[in-house]
């Protein structure tokens, strides 16, 4: 395996549209290590969409989990997406969205918003343990 220190793409006609890494073992395909001794978050991986016209509900980035089915077809079994909920300066809100294959169709199963967790499209909540609800909480059933 190459021991690269840097990958540099430069020049007016140099474009890297897709970087593909292939690993024939179950070892890490990508390992990002920080040796910083401080308490700040590290290492950091950033997915940035630099849109000239950002809008509410825009997707910002996505992590896809792919595999193959029994017909040897590539399938996106699940994905995690970042979205803009509110783009207004000073009141920005974001969403983390979870999608899974459900009966053969891509289905949004959960959204984590700034003020709530939504379980969608007949996704159930199952808890192995206790759910503690504070005395001053309002619980609506049905």
Provide a role label for each language-model segment:
Residues 83-87:
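Short beta-strand micro-motifs enriched in acidic
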Residues 2-7, 12-68, 75-79, 92-101, ...:
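Short Gly/Ser/Thr-biased coil->beta-strand turn/linker motifs
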Residues 70-71, 88:
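Residues at alpha-helix boundaries and short interhelical turns
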